[in-house]
From Swiss-Prot:
Pfam families: HMGL-like (PF00682), IPMS_D2 (PF22615), LeuA_dimer (PF08502). Residues 1-40, 581-612 are annotated as: Disordered. Homodimer. Remains a homodimer in the presence of L-leucine. The gene is leuA. Residues 491-644 are annotated as: Regulatory domain. This is 2-isopropylmalate synthase.
Amino acid sequence: MTTSESPDAYTESFGAHTIVKPAGPPRVGQPSWNPQRASSMPVNRYRPFAEEVEPIRLRNRTWPDRVIDRAPLWCAVDLRDGNQALIDPMSPARKRRMFDLLVRMGYKEIEVGFPSASQTDFDFVREIIEQGAIPDDVTIQVLTQCRPELIERTFQACSGAPRAIVHFYNSTSILQRRVVFRANRAEVQAIATDGARKCVEQAAKYPGTQWRFEYSPESYTGTELEYAKQVCDAVGEVIAPTPERPIIFNLPATVEMTTPNVYADSIEWMSRNLANRESVILSLHPHNDRGTAVAAAELGFAAGADRIEGCLFGNGERTGNVCLVTLGLNLFSRGVDPQIDFSNIDEIRRTVEYCNQLPVHERHPYGGDLVYTAFSGSHQDAINKGLDAMKLDADAADCDVDDMLWQVPYLPIDPRDVGRTYEAVIRVNSQSGKGGVAYIMKTDHGLSLPRRLQIEFSQVIQKIAEGTAGEGGEVSPKEMWDAFAEEYLAPVRPLERIRQHVDAADDDGGTTSITATVKINGVETEISGSGNGPLAAFVHALADVGFDVAVLDYYEHAMSAGDDAQAAAYVEASVTIASPAQPGEAGRHASDPVTIASPAQPGEAGRHASDPVTSKTVWGVGIAPSITTASLRAVVSAVNRAAR
């Protein structure tokens, strides 16, 4: 037995640590309704953010009241920050494919590499410059540390580019000052300002390029705010930006250390207090260590930032950078243009997966395989009703559904707006109900099941789902159709209709006669009857051979558009079968024609002189090129299901 097959072996594979149920005392003041207990986790090794860095208390904060109504300036860093985090960094071909995708999507600032640290990155920067691959409205960005020789190499890589952003950085956090640089505040600030002077010096040597500068106090979230401002202001004095040629100050959550509201407070404080703010583009670069990079980016943007750096689908060091797809489509879902084209999310995802050689998770917002899929019965029912309501509203407004305001429960956006279809919106497993079954039968198979039939058939599917490996597995649309056909369309015992001849009434109030050839338990016989329509006449004919059918409800519809469309008919009937049923002997009733009311009501339609003593109420379904044949097949289906 393999580890995957043995829970014990799987548990043992984790080594010495054993999960121990928390059994310590409750915390002081813990309410009686909370039964949780103290764990044995070594929480004493960690401390609150306010103790590790500093408390951030912003008075009169304004960001909680702001509504995001515009897109930030985006910068995609997939080719640098994303690439450096890959198990196998991108080849030149994969880099080029990612770059071309980002350009097509509409990103205007793209960080293309760290050319002073990697020959591959250097060569790629030269390639896209020399091949003229950079559109006129796109600015490439390159990263460098503040060391002079690395800055020189960076400018060499960008020589000949029409426009370029040189992004220089050094870490300013309390922890890195102490354990990495072993330097004081003034010494760390000098690293930044010396780097800025070197950048200005190098830019003068390459006048053919329009240079811009970005500075990041790396590990900003672990840096005191006053000190972060001090360093940025000092760098700004060296660069001397103007409103027309602003500097980018990028404030990265290099490591996410606290809740997004604290990050937002810090961004608003910096936005208020940075010198020469009108000449500064305030940029965010959130990582996802605590799983809240998207929230941090959105709140930080509301707090005064102008620009956001991130990666498609959140690739990046450790838990990744903020996801540009999620940020952009969050805006889109609230009616704000992200100024990026996400209209073919699957092409974007496939390209990213190819370039990164990493899969996008099935649950990743907007792009995962399952994000527009509902398994829950109540969710499926609500989605089904929402889509139907959209269609009805569009018909009433005499417009296309695609022009209607999107309002469908559980789906924040229309999957079709990002290139998905509705095929996978509802999938059925043991958690599903009638809504999901009805949706798939309608969208995949063209059958609009009446509500009570939905309930009946969903019970069939429930049994199949619960029996899938005993674990509540999924039932595919094909498996669902096979089950439906076996349950409603396939049975031919005890009754099978062979053919019929109908003499229709000349007027609406007249009598219709039918002569039909049927098989009863394999024996062919001819039956005849009359009524106020073909269905009533057929019911009357069946009564003469032992099948007492009272039609309780009836539905019909075309399964598609066009002259060659199949018709579907659904009959809910109370059926009593005489035993044994022999032609002309069992179940005979008065020879008066049978009348079926329209609409048929329980107990009224198809009733004969003597009420049945015992009966089964069942649904029958018929599908045929003509609605008459479909309705007769539905009656036969009901009889055969009642005989089970």
